[in-house]
Amino acid sequence: MKVIFNADDFGLTQGVNNGIIKAHQQGVVLSTTMMMGMDAEQHAVELANQNPNLKIGVHLRFTAGNPLTGHPNLTGGGEQFVRFNELWKKRDFQEEAVYQEAVAQVERFLSLGLPLSHIDSHHHAHTHPQLLPVIRRVAEQYRVPLRGSGLCHIDCDTTYHFTDEFYDQGVSLDGVMAHLKSLKSQYDVVEVMCHPADVDQHLLSISGYALLRELELQVLTSPILKQELAEHGMSITDYSTLISTRKFASV
């Protein structure tokens, strides 16, 4: 089985960026997704250019910061996106507003000269029932996978699964290995969501999920994790292992 450890939130803060790069250089992270238009975006670009083997996708924002398009349908009444807890209650998203914002974020990424690996979203916003069909269309437009568990269909030989078990109280080396071993007989490729970081004051001020990111970083850079993955016949990979199927993920 192949395992994609994808680090979310690249570009959120410099501490997050530094943690992701450590997890890449010293650990098992070969894939990350970048938040466009956030404070540490340029820092992330500099690090990306220094680490060409790190595959990077877009971590679409619909619950953090301001829309690049400024479209009022996407905000909570001010300049910022709707809050996370309000996103799931909202049922009046305008399809064109969502589409234009997603395209704006992807185009901003491409303008930086970075190859686009795949698409996912902050707080899993793309799984909102009104956003999902639009974001799936955007992924198909750019011919990249979209994070989710519906990647492979009847005519696809590769089975894929996304897991968010490595989060919060689920962060441990023993826990992630036990979970992966339980999936090995069912899937060819498993994506593990992760959030490594060197916690900085900026992160503490904007995120309710901060301190455990350092524990994630410890696990992801542990030599024991690499050893156990190898012992159980698991290899680390990135989204390029899925692109060759010419299928697009959905949830």
Curated annotation (Swiss-Prot):
Cross-referenced InterPro entries: COD_ChbG_bac, Glyco_hydro/deAcase_b/a-brl, YdjC-like
Summary of subunit composition and partner proteins: Homodimer.
Family statement: Belongs to the YdjC deacetylase family.
Lineage: Bacteria, Pseudomonadati, Pseudomonadota, Gammaproteobacteria, Vibrionales
Residues annotated to bind Mg(2+): H59, H122
EC number: 3.5.1.-
Name under which the protein is recorded: Carbohydrate deacetylase
Keywords, comma-separated and alphabetical: Carbohydrate metabolism, Hydrolase, Magnesium, Metal-binding
Cofactor(s) in the UniProt record: Mg(2+)
Function: Probably catalyzes the deacetylation of acetylated carbohydrates an important step in the degradation of oligosaccharides.
Broad enzyme group: hydrolase
GO function terms (MF aspect): deacetylase activity; hydrolase activity, acting on carbon-nitrogen (but not peptide) bonds, in linear amides; metal ion binding
Gene Ontology BP, a term: polysaccharide catabolic process
PANTHER family attached to this UniProt entry: CARBOHYDRATE DEACETYLASE, YDJC DEACETYLASE FAMILY MEMBER
